[in-house]
């Protein structure tokens, strides 16, 4: 896999520039594997991704999608942004407001709680442009319950040797940042969001800028946090969120041929 988990290369406006191509290829320089890949989740939501892949790949790549019950997914997503200091509205308000707006390309605030869970809506484009034999669907629920079997099904899909044992998989833990404002200021500085950071290239050498950026990225002070134990979703809100996704999940089952038995909300 790429040395950077989510390169977001194929979403870039200037993805064909020599600089972007070289940086992307460098993410795989240490790989001696027959198969390489990466895991940028936002590719699922950008139509340009499919157009660009079809244009530049003679042979279709393979896609593995890990889907989670959309009700649980959006609630976890909400608390993730709360912990980062990027959300202060109630969950119900955040979700319903998102459902009322159109989806558009996003940057530092990926608060599409409703839209990200419209799996059938997003996957239809993949099934329309690539053969189903090149698309693998697994669920987070199956990955947690039977990780070895689920991962081996992916290995089989990729035509590589299956595993006999598997080390425990550590799940992501929702946290609350101790200094969220400093954390986001740091991220914006690194991304060059402020005029002063854009102007700095005329005052500081590229080598010095790279050094400072690396120091900021590795400074754990900005990422200081503690576990965030959030409340369970109420039955009333759970029923409401379910109603938003019922038609999409029904279409998802038809599209993929999967029953999604682990999603109890949609299999009563």
Model-derived regions: residue spans:
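Anion-recognition interface
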Residues: 1-268
């Amino acid at each position: 896999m790429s040395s950077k988990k989510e390169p977001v290369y194929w979403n870039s406006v200037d993805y064909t520039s020599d600089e972007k191509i070289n940086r992307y290829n460098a993410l795989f320089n240490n790989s001696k594997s027959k198969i390489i890949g990466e895991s940028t989740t936002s590719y699922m939501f950008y139509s340009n991704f499919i157009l660009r892949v079809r244009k530049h790949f003679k042979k279709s790549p393979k896609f593995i999608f890990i889907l989670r019950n959309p009700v649980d997914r959006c609630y976890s997503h909400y608390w993730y942004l709360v912990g980062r200091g990027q959300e202060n509205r109630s969950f119900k308000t955040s979700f319903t407001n998102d459902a009322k707006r159109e989806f558009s390309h996003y940057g530092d605030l990926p608060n599409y709680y409703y839209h990200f869970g419209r799996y059938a809506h997003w996957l239809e484009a993949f099934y329309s442009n690539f053969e189903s034999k090149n698309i693998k669907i697994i669920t987070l629920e199956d990955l947690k319950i039977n990780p070895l079997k689920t991962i081996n099904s992916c290995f089989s899909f990729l035509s590589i040797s299956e595993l006999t044992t598997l080390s425990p998989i550590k799940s992501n833990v929702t946290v609350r940042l101790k200094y969220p404002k400093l954390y986001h200021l740091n991220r914006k500085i690194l991304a060059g969001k402020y005029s002063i950071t854009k102007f700095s290239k005329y005052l500081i050498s590229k080598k010095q800028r790279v050094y400072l950026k690396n120091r900021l990225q590795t400074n754990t002070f900005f990422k200081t946090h503690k576990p965030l134990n959030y409340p369970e979703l109420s039955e009333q809100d759970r029923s409401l969120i379910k109603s938003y996704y019922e038609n999409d999940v029904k279409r998802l089952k038809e599209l993929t041929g999967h029953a999604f038995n682990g999603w109890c909300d949609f299999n009563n």
